[in-house]
Structures are given as C-alpha cells and as structure tokens.
C-alpha cells in the first residue's frame, strides 16, 4: 500500500530543498507550484483570461499582471483558487495513479497551502518544513523581486508556522543546513517503513 506524503511549509522554510532530498531518496515528487506554472501556460489561460481580463499575453498568464490584480483586491485570490485548484488536483491524482501503477512505496505531493486548502485529507502523512523566523525572512528577502510588502502579503495568506508544526506528523528543521535536513528525511522514511 503506497503512502502519500504531503510536504508543506511557509515561504522561505526550505520546502523546495527538502522535496529534492525526498526525490534523492527515490520518492516520486510532484511540485504543486510547478504544476501551477505549467497550467499558466496551458489549460488555465482561457479561464484566467475570462475571470481577469488583461492578465494574459501570447497565450500565457502574465504573473506580474495577475499579481497586480490580486494585490489590488485580495478577494480575487478566492476566484483564482476556484479556477486553479481543481486543475492542480487532477494533475495530483494522475501523478498518484502513475506512482501506484509503478508500485512505489511512497509518493510526495509538495503543496505550499496544504492545510489552507484542506489537502491534508488527501494525504496519509504530513511533513512540515520549518526554520527560525529570522532565517525565513533572510531567505525570502534575498529572492529576486521580493519586497517586504510581498512577503507580508504571502505570510498573511498562510497558516502560522507554529500551527502547521502542531498539525504535522513530522517536522523537518531546515535551519541547520542541507545535511541535517537530509538525515531528517531519511529518518522519516525509515519510520514510515522504507
């Protein structure tokens, strides 16, 4: 019986790196952010263009323009999620079906808003990636194009880290470097029966 792992963590916590560590241990990983970026170049385009006119260019969603629309009216986030989340779920289900056919012991869904979207009900175990708030802030503000305002807007839409940790089956502390995180990933897989 395949175990579906849901990986989550607030922005700048080291989730992408941790997902790579699971992949290096042979776990198939689906990155929900990458799925969304793909949808922004494919089937979500006409739906987003209809909901938010002027946010697409040359058959692709212009993420800058879409971001401006969302910042002007945060209620638009819900409308966008109503469009995108079902499409993402379809991709996740196809990914999990393939992993089952391939007789994998584990499959990992990397879902930034796992708790916020109720996705924990679709996974067997939840792993939360966390680190100290000052490390998180430093990581995020060093990203190209990131501002304090954008960071605060993203944080406001995410469940507080302490609550995520409390609801997790496992927590990976990414604040002590990649090798320490790798050891934690291996330990989680051992506990789950790898």
Curated annotation (Swiss-Prot):
InterPro entries assigned: Depp_CoAkinase, P-loop_NTPase
Name of the coding gene: coaE
GO terms (BP aspect): coenzyme A biosynthetic process
GO CC, alphabetical: cytoplasm
Annotated coiled-coil segments of the chain: none
Key words of the record: ATP-binding, Coenzyme A biosynthesis, Cytoplasm, Kinase, Nucleotide-binding, Transferase
SUPFAM superfamilies, per the entry: P-loop containing nucleoside triphosphate hydrolases
GO molecular function, one term: dephospho-CoA kinase activity
Pfam families xref list: CoaE
Binding positions (ATP): 12-17
Summary of the function given for this chain in its UniProt record: Catalyzes the phosphorylation of the 3'-hydroxyl group of dephosphocoenzyme A to form coenzyme A.
Name assigned to this protein: Dephospho-CoA kinase
Origin superkingdom: Bacteria
PROSITE patterns the record matches: DPCK
Organism per entry: Agrobacterium fabrum (strain C58 / ATCC 33970) (Agrobacterium tumefaciens (strain C58))
Assigned EC number: 2.7.1.24
Catalytic activity: 3'-dephospho-CoA + ATP = ADP + CoA + H(+)
Domain DPCK positions: 4-194
Protein family per UniProt: Belongs to the CoaE family.
Pathway in which this enzyme or protein is active: Cofactor biosynthesis; coenzyme A biosynthesis; CoA from (R)-pantothenate: step 5/5
Alphabetized PANTHER family for the sequence: BIFUNCTIONAL COENZYME A SYNTHASE-RELATED, DEPHOSPHO-COA KINASE-RELATED
Cited HAMAP family: Dephospho_CoA_kinase
Compartments in which it is found: Cytoplasm
């Amino acid at each position: 019986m395949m175990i579906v792992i849901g990986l989550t963590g607030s922005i700048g916590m080291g989730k992408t790196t941790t997902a790579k560590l699971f992949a290096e241990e042979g776990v198939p990983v689906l990155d929900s952010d990458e799925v969304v970026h793909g949808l922004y170049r494919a089937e979500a385009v006409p739906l987003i263009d209809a909901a938010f006119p002027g946010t697409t260019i040359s058959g692709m969603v212009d993420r800058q323009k879409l971001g401006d629309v969302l910042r002007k009216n945060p209620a638009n986030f819900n409308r966008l999620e109503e469009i995108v989340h079902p499409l993402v779920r379809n991709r996740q289900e196809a990914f999990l079906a393939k992993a089952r056919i391939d007789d994998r012991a584990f499959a990992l869904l990397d879902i930034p808003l796992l708790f916020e979207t109720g996705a924990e009900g679709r996974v067997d175990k939840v792993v939360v990636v966390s680190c100290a708030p000052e490390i998180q802030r430093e990581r995020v503000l060093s990203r190209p194009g990131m501002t304090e305002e954008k960071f605060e807007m993203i944080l406001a839409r995410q469940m507080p880290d302490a609550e995520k940790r409390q609801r997790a089956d496992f927590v990976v502390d990414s604040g002590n470097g990649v090798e320490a995180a790798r050891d934690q990933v291996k330990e989680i897989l051992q506990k789950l029966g790898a």
